[in-house]
């Protein structure tokens, strides 16, 4: 089979259409076509065509993963599940994840640290709830243990309560206690920590 034309595809994607023996045969990422050195009048065997298809699939899978990572760091499990939903095959997905690991773009330890730090800075919650969230992201328990064990529930509950307490009326202690307690419970804190935090906040806010 001989390449008789290589034409730019329609739309915003950087793809090219390859024609063999005068007929449209397949499309490729333009980057793949350049890297493989495709030229008009070049002869392609069936095995070469299949190899090009595999390379194109991998490249599209890689681009999808990098785009997904552009919003925030992701766990390995999140990336794998996302690519599976996009319909990429298992071989390409595993090859892409391996490449991203080599480049330092996928690292579950770094991701878990990011997640914990982000939560503690902007939306403090309990060690238990942080652990649950990371487990839902597919992070391994041994990594979770290393990262989450440093979370101090008493400190996190106090910081979580600071902004909430200021929005609560101080004329009714029972209402203050109930509303702040419910708020901290939703953040995953236990009974003892909640009671201690409510007592501390009531003293500070009602001075």
PLM ranges: what are they?
Residues 1-207:
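An alpha-helical, amphipathic repeat domain used for nucleic-acid recognition
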């Amino acid at each position: 089979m001989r390449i008789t034309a290589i034409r730019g595809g329609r739309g915003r994607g950087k793809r090219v259409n390859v024609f063999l023996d005068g007929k449209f045969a397949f499309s490729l990422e333009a980057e793949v076509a350049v890297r493989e050195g495709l030229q008009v009048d070049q002869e392609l065997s069936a095995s070469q065509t299949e190899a090009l298809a595999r390379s194109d699939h991998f490249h599209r899978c890689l681009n999808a993963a990098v785009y997904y990572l552009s919003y925030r760091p992701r766990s390995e499990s999140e990336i794998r599940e996302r690519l599976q939903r996009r319909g990429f095959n298992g071989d390409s997905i595993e090859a892409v994840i391996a490449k991203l690991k080599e480049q330092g773009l996928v690292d579950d330890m770094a991701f878990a640290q990011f997640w914990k730090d982000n939560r503690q800075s902007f939306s403090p919650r309990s060690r238990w709830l942080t652990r649950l969230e990371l487990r839902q992201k597919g992070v391994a328990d041994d990594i979770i243990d290393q990262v989450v064990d440093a979370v101090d529930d008493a400190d996190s509950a106090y910081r979580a309560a600071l902004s909430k307490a200021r929005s609560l009326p101080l004329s009714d202690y029972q209402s203050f206690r109930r509303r702040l307690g419910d708020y901290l419970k939703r953040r995953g804190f236990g009974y003892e920590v909640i009671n201690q935090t409510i007592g501390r906040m009531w003293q500070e806010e009602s001075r």
